[in-house]
A protein has these predicted regions:
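Family-specific signature for flavin-dependent thymidylate synthase
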Residues: 1-235
């Protein structure tokens, strides 16, 4: 068995906390219609998994569940959450998803922020609709890395002053730069919901920061459902 926790970037990670089911689960969840069951994952079972995925018979994939803990910048978390909300317009993807996030109303651990390295800043894409283009010149990146560092340092100073003056955490947090701030959350989804997330966030036009996390989710999910996930991602 591989690692259950994968580092992402300088500070982030994805941790597989728990799961329910195996590759054999969607097979037997589909076979219940005929009051049959398989005890081993052979070629027939693998063909059935592929058939179910290819023909969008997705309900058998909703009984298997994965539970992740994620530590990522808020801008990644909000994209992730938007995907979960949007899935309600699909074939019930949201019915087996859950989300619980840490709150700075209650915790005062030292804030962590995403600060891109000078060579990690990206340009506006040619079509200008969304996403990003090629990296900007390093000297331009250096300017904005330094500017962001100064901005965060001043924000942290104001946050700490407010806390020292007995301002409540739920208001003191207003001084923290939101989108760069790392947050921690637990995300639980059915195997189908996880595959739906991966199909969107592994795409080349997905934002790099969330794509990095999606690659970690994929590695962890493949550890537990190699055949079923492959079928869903290639359907």
């Amino acid at each position: 068995m591989g690692k259950l926790k994968i580092p992402v970037g300088e500070h982030g990670y994805v941790l597989l906390k728990d799961w329910m089911g195996t590759d054999l689960s969607p097979v037997n969840d589909a076979k219940v219609s005929f009051d049959k069951e398989s005890t081993e994952l052979g070629d027939r079972e693998k063909r059935l998994i592929k058939y179910l995925a290819d023909h969008q018979h997705t309900s058998p994939f909703r009984h298997s569940v994965l539970k992740f803990e994620v530590y990522a910048p808020l801008m990644v978390a909000r994209q992730w959450w938007k995907h979960i909300i949007g899935s309600e317009h699909g074939e019930g993807f949201d019915r087996l998803t859950a989300w619980n996030e840490s709150s700075r109303r209650y915790i005062t651990e030292e804030p962590t922020f995403l600060i891109p390295k000078p060579d990690a800043w990206r340009s506006v894409p040619e079509n200008r609709k969304q996403g990003s283009g090629d990296p900007v010149a390093v000297e331009v990146g250096e300017k904005y890395t330094e500017a962001l560092q100064k901005h965060i340092a001043e924000s942290l100073r104001l946050y700490e002053v407010a806390m020292a003056d007995n301002i409540c955490p739920e208001q003191a947090r207003l001084f923290l730069p939101a989108y760069a701030l790392y947050v921690r959350w637990v995300w639980t989804g059915s195997l189908q919901a996880v595959a739906h997330f991966l199909n969107l966030r592994l795409a080349e036009d997905a934002q790099k920061e969330i794509r990095d996390y999606a690659q970690a989710v994929e590695k962890l999910a493949r550890e537990k459902f190699p055949v079923a996930l492959e079928a869903l991602l290639n359907a």
